[in-house]
């Protein structure tokens, strides 16, 4: 997809701090980190999200990359979180499948903020 920023990063058309790459995926530091370690794992082929007929081999490559990133950054020893937002209501802002790998601090117990009584 020619206007997709993650496609451009995967194709080395725009600069990024790449921390892992293989034939199927690229992993790079998030430009707006939400934790001391915040890496995005992205397939090189464009898929809108995790339910976009993604081949099992690509998902396996993504999970493998998560493990490599966790090990290489040391968050495999302290704990980390993996998130794949799917759709606008879930907070997906770039519609190219990606996994967030977050760690390097105490991320707390909850996955999302508790709803307020007004919600």
Where are these regions (language model features)?
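HIT superfamily nucleotide-processing domains
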Residues: 1-119
